[in-house]
Amino acid sequence: MSRNLKGVLVVLAVVGLASEQRAHADTESKFAELRDKSDRFEGSFAAFLDRFVGECNDPLEASTCKQASAEFRKKVKGKKFYFIIGEDQVSNLSAGSYNPSRNEFTVNLTPFFPAGGYALTQGAPKKTDANGNPVFPFLPIKVKLPPDFSPQRFARTIGNKEVRMQLVFTPQDTWAIAKRGGGKLEGVRAQLEGVVLSLASSGDTLGAYYGR
């Protein structure tokens, strides 16, 4: 190989790496802006859903509970909120396809975020699957494979719950759908503003979804 050609290849490699770093920086800065403009809830994600839904099963406290939930919904509707979903709680990701020419992996995000018996969703569910779970279309997230990761290793990373999630959403209303065998499933209908995935082991950003 000629010295000139080697020089060209080195330049191309550096340009490619710089482009990838810029893409990650853009992803992080765009999400950081959303995050920094969001409200914080003093409590867990599960506690937020519980207060918003306000199922109020205790008959002795039902009236007070429902009033408190109604006031909470009025207070937070239309505001953006930020939460971190730990890797042990992330259950709505699945491995999609791999594009070898771009070294790009598609992670399928189901916009169903369960916690504490309820779930936050993008829109309200219309039906359930054979297992009684609400059905939603995937939201694809394009991920550049991290260094030293094969497609197989990355798929295992998804399956082994080694991915952390940051979430910004705007709560809109409650929803309920009949549950197989009786009863109902309930949750919070929301607009997903942004979702960022990162490796739990290093914190490195993998990719992001933006709703608007």
Label for each model-derived stretch:
Residues 1, 16-17:
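Coiled-coil-like amphipathic alpha-helices with heptad-repeat character
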Residues 9-16:
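Bacterial N-terminal signal peptides
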Residues 1-9:
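Bacterial N-terminal signal peptides that target proteins for export
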